[in-house]
Amino acid sequence: MITPRHQPQRGAKATMQHVLIIHEVEDYPAWKAVFDQAAAIRKHAGEIRYQLLRYDDAANHIVHFSEWTSLAAARQFFESPELVEIRRKAGVKMPQFIFLHEIERGDL
């Protein structure tokens, strides 16, 4: 079972926590349908926002970049048996997870 997201401590400076997932899917439209159906559980687990990208020469190679309330919440979610089953049903092949702390952001 996926537990509710972790909240930053009151008064603590919020730093952005991100997860970068790179994976191949069997069929993008089928994967996207499962991804969209999981929106509520992703939000409940602590995902704040996301961005989906694909390789310019391979429509089934997906990059999922997301912001989380905490990396602990993200790890708990992505390692949960429930999500392993969702990935299997969605046709995900060998996902690579990169957990990231934001250190700087700027506009040019």
Task: Please give the residue ranges for each predicted region.
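Short S/T/G/P-rich N-terminal loop/turn motif that feeds into the first structured element of a domain
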Residues: I2-E85, K89-L108
